[in-house]
């Protein structure tokens, strides 16, 4: 059974459009999680393809300073895995959502209960950046009968043989990491990045989205040439926190990208 997230993104591809995923931090709002529905509606109205939602964690190894600070603000609003799932169960959206979480919060929740409870939400994908491929079976068997896709991250330093291993069981999409390091570190792309992404795109059977450091319309154009779309996090998280209204025009243009 092909997962809903894969089908949704493949439909966007067939329409000749670039896939655009904004990242937001759950609970990073003056109303805490009570503001989540408002933020999702704002993004949905701008035409985004799906939305990645971060669950805050006290030791976020993959997060740059902007997202780390957003996580701290969210924790200050007492956001937890339980409270996020409860909020998502009340949410009305047509968009598939993806949760990006470290392993510890969902382990504390109970993996089986977490997967079961997400079945009553619009969440269709999971990204767990600190779960090694070799340990994927901690959660993968629980997803077999669910509509949740476990999304792999493929870095620049991943060799071809390892890439093939990572993507052969992948569902939803492939998260191609554009930089070595943490999120939000823009302007320091490797010279062979486009070639790396193009090769990954050639061997993947599901959409490949480029993230980490993507922050300009030039980036959006560049990475839509060599992958199926982009994920933008730090730029959006910062703008939402600062109430920078200009972010709407950026999101709308990036989300409307035509191949």
Curated annotation (Swiss-Prot):
Keywords: Amino-acid biosynthesis, Aromatic amino acid biosynthesis, Lyase, Tryptophan biosynthesis. One of its GO terms (molecular function) is tryptophan synthase activity. PANTHER family: TRYPTOPHAN SYNTHASE ALPHA CHAIN, CHLOROPLASTIC, TRYPTOPHAN SYNTHASE, ALPHA CHAIN. It is an enzyme of class 4 (lyase). It catalyses: (1S,2R)-1-C-(indol-3-yl)glycerol 3-phosphate + L-serine = D-glyceraldehyde 3-phosphate + L-tryptophan + H2O. Pathway: Amino-acid biosynthesis; L-tryptophan biosynthesis; L-tryptophan from chorismate: step 5/5. NCBIfam families: trpA. Its EC number is 4.2.1.20. CDD domains: Tryptophan_synthase_alpha (cd04724). The gene is trpA. Belongs to the TrpA family. HAMAP family: Trp_synth_alpha. Tetramer of two alpha and two beta chains. Pfam families: Trp_syntA. It comes from Streptococcus gordonii (strain Challis / ATCC 35105 / BCRC 15272 / CH1 / DL1 / V288). The alpha subunit is responsible for the aldol cleavage of indoleglycerol phosphate to indole and glyceraldehyde 3-phosphate. This is Tryptophan synthase alpha chain.
């Amino acid at each position: 059974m092909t997962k809903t997230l894969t089908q949704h993104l493949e439909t966007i591809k067939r329409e000749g459009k670039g896939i655009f995923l904004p990242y937001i931090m759950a609970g990073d709002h003056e109303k805490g999680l009570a503001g989540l529905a408002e933020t999702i509606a704002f993004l949905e109205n701008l035409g985004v393809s799906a939305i990645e939602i971060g669950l805050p964690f006290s030791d976020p190894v993959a997060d740059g300073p902007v997202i780390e600070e957003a996580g701290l603000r969210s924790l200050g609003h007492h956001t937890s895995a339980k409270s996020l799932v409860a909020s998502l169960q009340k949410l009305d959206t047509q968009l598939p959502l993806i949760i990006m979480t470290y392993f510890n919060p969902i382990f504390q929740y109970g993996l089986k209960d977490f997967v079961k409870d997400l079945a009553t939400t619009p969440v269709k994908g999971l990204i767990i950046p600190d779960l090694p491929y070799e340990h994927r079976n901690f959660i993968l068997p629980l997803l077999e009968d669910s509509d949740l896709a476990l999304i792999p991250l493929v870095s620049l330093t991943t060799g071809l043989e390892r890439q093939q291993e990572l993507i052969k069981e992948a569902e939803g999409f492939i998260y191609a990491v554009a930089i070595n390091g943490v999120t939000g570190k823009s302007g320091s792309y490797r010279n062979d990045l486009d070639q790396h992404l193009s090769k990954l795109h050639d061997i993947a059977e599901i959409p490949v989205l480029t993230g980490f450091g993507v922050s300009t319309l030039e980036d959006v154009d560049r990475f839509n040439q060599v992958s199926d779309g982009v994920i933008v996090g730090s730029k959006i998280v910062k703008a939402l926190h600062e109430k920078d209204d200009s972010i709407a025009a950026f999101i709308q243009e990036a989300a409307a990208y035509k191949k």
